Regions:
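A short beta-loop-beta micro-motif enriched in histidine and acidic residues
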Residues: 65-68, 80-96
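Short beta-strand His + acidic residue motifs that chelate non-heme Fe in jelly-roll/DSBH
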Residues: 85, 104-105, 123, 129-136
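A short hydrophobic beta-strand segment most commonly corresponding to one strand
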Residues: 137-153
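A short, N-terminal "cap"/entry segment at the start of jelly-roll beta-barrel domains
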Residues: 5, 23-71, 112-114, 156-162
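Glycine- and acidic-residue-biased ligand/ion/polar-headgroup-sensing regions
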Residues: 88-109, 119
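Bacterial N-terminal signal peptides that target proteins for export
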Residues: 1-10
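Bacterial N-terminal signal peptides
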Residues: 9-19
């Protein structure tokens, strides 16, 4: 009897350990893992990522806005690729996962967040920073719509060789 109780206890402990280390499901941070103060996260460099600007809309004159643009991009992340660490303090964004699976490492969640095709996530707020990884061998594709300034739009323009 003692052996089976011990075995069950060890199995339960291992299950709890793996559950704590496993990414969150359903594309959002579990309520009990949401942080009220942002944590430090790794400063990751981008690996295997390509970005294509699909459209840019000048918001000049709309509700008194000037110098800001609504931009939509397509990002393709290679298998085992990384979207670098970046902030959304001053750049609201909505990301839609078109294809594949990504894991987000966020300053406001104590566990990694798993995102799958068909899911979306808002990105904005003081202290909001994150990086994404593609844990699979297959490419992942997302669209990202954000509000950016003229300098950011200029960075998106193709460089002309003269």
């Amino acid at each position: 009897m003692m052996k089976s109780t011990t075995t069950i206890g060890i199995a339960a402990a291992l299950a709890a350990l793996f559950a704590a280390a496993a990414p969150a499901e359903a594309g959002q941070c579990p309520k009990d893992k949401v942080l009220t103060v942002p944590r430090d996260i790794e400063g990751m460099d981008g690996v295997g990522i390509s970005r294509e600007t699909l459209a840019t809309v000048d918001l000049k004159g709309w509700r008194g806005v000037g110098g800001l643009f609504l931009r939509t991009r397509r990002l393709t992340i290679a298998g085992h690729g990384i979207v670098p660490t970046h902030e959304h303090d001053d750049r609201p964004s909505i990301v839609f996962i078109v294809k594949g699976e990504l894991i987000e490492h966020s300053t406001y969640c104590s566990v990694p967040i798993r995102h799958k095709a068909g899911e979306w996530t808002p990105e904005f707020g003081k202290g909001h920073a994150h990086w994404w990884e593609n844990p699979t061998d297959q490419e992942a594709v997302v669209t990202s719509s954000d509000i950016v300034d003229q300098e950011t739009v200029d960075l998106d323009k193709p460089k002309m060789d003269m």
